């Protein structure tokens, strides 16, 4: 057999296997069947299995008998594949599908539809193929951060369909105040969605093998709760609405009410993400910050277990308190130095190891340096102590109007690869919304996450970008001359702090008493012509370069639009 691997670097713009995530294919020759992509109308199951939800060319397919059906399918849990895996064989006259489970059957039809779409686009019949496909990571969720804004409700249903076609199987939704809490009505914002609406979305997602799980911040990041007058008495510091007092019993009464509403709104969820990051506490009752953090963590993990949810916890604070945090983000430090830090400070963790809840998932987030020795060592520490660890990478970090660093694809690929190597259950793609960029701008990073969490790390990043262009804009647009997203990142990044003074800090502008004086550059003095331009010469040159790049990008996008590209909506967002 000749093996044709779709994640091979020889992938070409006229290839009918332009699929994300990529699949491994074997075929005797590059032969074609007698099957017309537009004439696949009936499917038959030898075991009376039901046709899953379908898309595109298969959207209107119906059940037929054995003779009239082009597709013959069955579920067989004895096949040697992981859950969600499937075998798809395209023969001269028939298409045969054997799936490990219902989820695998759904993904087999998703893959088949993309093959049919590509055959139609290439004006060929359907290629003869033999496919055996399964995920590299079991749990492949994205993060939906609703803290700062929401989209139209219909957008989220469309998003579910988009994610399903990428074989994403989970969402962790950071609800904050975007759930209309029944138990604590003061917390839900004016644009929050009802529990009933969230149930409807959860049902829609579940039918497409996507499980929605809630994230409700607890110990810290609690301003959306503690800003309300009736909850001020629960603050850790009376003057700050950032954190709860973990020793006040009413803290848990309130938090558990929110959890119950969130669980009701996500009836199919397996997890309850409890947050817990970036919080410093007042030491009280002779307890250290680490002890206070673990008191809270144990109480909320016990609650989660009682309500049949697995708690997920951002893990940074215990590692900070123990003194092993910084090496995770330092790629300049040597392995020897990292080991010395751990040898000195690991005792700070081990002194409380019995208080680390065993039912929690410790989410080791690292968005830029996931491949550092320090980060990998921290993940191994959890596993070595029989604690469950899962990574979190990022498709959008913070404070920019579009993702940076090639949509963060190198880091996504790296963390997915190490997660597979360490045989972890999954990986989360965070998508932070601090600047409320348009969600469409996250789509390339999401596609990369789908690629490397399902198919592994064999596809080079350059080839993935080419595949993304082909898949989203058309098979004729794979060449580098049509690439523009990486170029556009540069002017967006430059404008981030273009008008800030040397000591200006953009995220903190809203908290400054007079940011126009303390953080923003001065305006020109008309009585001193030329002085301002000389002082800000570097900024002016950056602005000129930014404009030049933007004009080139605009030309490429307009060329794509005029050349009848697919996905005009995405192009219009970039434009």
Could you tell me what each predicted segment is?
Residues 7-103, 107, 111-131, 313-318, ...:
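Acidic, contiguous N-terminal accessory segments
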Residues 1-6:
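Bacterial N-terminal signal peptides
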Residues 81-85, 90-305, 312, 390-393, ...:
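Feature activates predominantly on carbohydrate-active enzymes
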Residues 69-71, 94-96, 140-141, 360-361, ...:
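Structural motif
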Residues 53, 110, 154-155, 373-377:
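Generic recognition of short, well-ordered alpha-helical segments
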Residues 55, 156-157, 409:
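Short amphipathic alpha-helical segment that frequently serves as the phosphate-/nucleotide-binding helix
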Residues 34-39, 135-140, 358:
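A short, charged/proline- and glycine-enriched loop
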Residues 17-33, 49-51, 200-203, 209, ...:
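Substrate-binding groove of N-acetylhexosamine-processing glycoside hydrolases
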